[in-house]
UniProtKB/Swiss-Prot annotation:
N5-methylglutamine sites (modified residues): Q251
Name of protein: Peptide chain release factor 2
Keyword Protein biosynthesis: yes
Gene designation: prfB
Organism for this UniProt entry: Helicobacter pylori (strain Shi470)
Maturation and modification: Methylated by PrmC. Methylation increases the termination efficiency of RF2.
Length: 363
């Protein structure tokens, strides 16, 4: 890096910071925080538990956003001032240090951008993830299990918790389907753009001739809804099926019909849960999944109407990302149009750069 390149980087980052300030309005955030603090001083504030909880969550979010912005702005201003002084004094040591810290400065501005993008209505929610293999039998079922592990490892890396709702083993390898919840701050906000088809190209470990195979799996993400969000489901619109939960190889792991499958006729959505030995708990979890999917579907319809466009089909034609393991190694996302070479790390859950790249591309 040289003086000109660093100078242009500072201008670009300052411009981004100015735009961020126009969006978040730091002074208004301070005023809102003062208002919330006064509201919390009222002895009657905590009588409405749900409202108090939501207000406190908003206070935490605003505080974090303001602190992140101010810290980044201060660092950027200090770097700009130091750069000007170092240039005037021909201080090569300081200039070299500034060049080394440039990626950190750039990342801090990007972090504020991400914070803004994770301020949607449901972004702070837990994420319900459903993975289904495409056509292709064992190949696609194995690919679905690889994706499942990738998201679990991502959750582990972030210190998030996960809970299985439904898990169906594949006949030879992999899985026929899985539904699970990732619980953590902004889990849905980060993962919401994972909706779509994920494509894998590799030398098949199941092919004796070691031929290259292409496999597909569908990922669907919906927010876990708070209990205070009311979604009406007409009983005549659904069918409940009860069956025995199955383990590996089709073995019955429960003698009672504790597993629950719900079919919603108007939308064609099917959800199922067999995680618990209690049919009642499985039914409650399946209903929660259905409500989350219906809520997500309605939001997508509203957004499509607002943009005056048709809702994009989340199906086998909606391919969002390719993972190529042979003849070369590369992961490419169709939304950010960015390619990544650290395929092994990505499949081990190192997907933050991809998730953030898509968030920025869709901003």
């Amino acid at each position: 890096m040289d003086n000109y390149t660093y100078s242009e980087l500072l201008k670009s980052l300052q411009n981004k910071c100015d735009n961020i300030a126009l969006i978040i309005k730091p002074e208004k955030i301070k005023q809102e925080l003062e208002r919330i603090e006064k509201e919390q001083e009222d002895p009657n504030f905590w009588q409405d538990v749900l409202k108090a909880r939501d207000t406190n969550k908003e206070k935490v979010r605003l505080n974090r956003l303001l602190e992140t912005y101010q810290k980044t702005k201060n660092s950027l201003d200090e770097s700009t001032e130091l750069f000007e002084l170092a240039q005037n004094d021909n201080d090569e040591v300081t200039l070299s240090l500034l060049y080394e810290e440039a990626p950190v400065l750039e990342h801090s501005v990007q972090k504020v951008e991400i914070e803004i993008m994770l301020s949607g209505e449901n972004d702070a929610s837990n994420a319900i993830i459903t993975i289904q293999p495409g056509a292709g039998g064992t190949e696609s079922q194995d690919w679905a299990s690889i994706l499942y592990r990738m998201y679990l490892r991502w959750a582990e890396r972030r210190g998030f918790k996960s809970e299985i709702l439904d898990y169906q083993d594949g006949e030879e390898a992999g899985i026929k389907g899985v539904a699970f919840i990732i619980k953590g701050e902004n889990a849905y906000g980060y993962l919401k753009n994972e909706n779509g088809v994920h494509r894998l190209v590799r030398i098949s470990p199941f092919d004796a001739n070691a031929k290259r195979h292409t496999s597909f799996a569908s990922v669907q993400i919906s927010p876990e809804l708070d209990d205070d969000i009311d979604i009406e489901i007409d009983e005549k619109d659904v069918r409940y099926d009860y069956y025995r939960a199955s383990g590996a190889g089709g073995q019955h792991v429960n003698k009672t019909e504790s597993a629950v499958r719900i079919t919603h006729f108007p939308t064609g959505i099917v959800v199922q849960c067999q995680n618990d030995r209690s049919q009642h708990k499985n039914k409650a979890s399946a209903l929660k999944m259905l409500k989350s999917k219906l809520y997500e579907l309605e939001l997508e319809k509203q957004q499509s109407t607002a943009k005056n466009e048709e809702k994009s089909e989340i199906g086998w034609g909606h391919q969002i990302r390719s993972y190529v393991l042979a003849p070369y190694q590369q992961v490419k996302d169709a939304r950010s149009n960015t390619a990544y070479s650290n395929v092994e790390a990505i499949l081990d859950g190192d997907i933050d750069a991809i998730l953030e790249g898509v968030l920025i591309a869709k901003a």
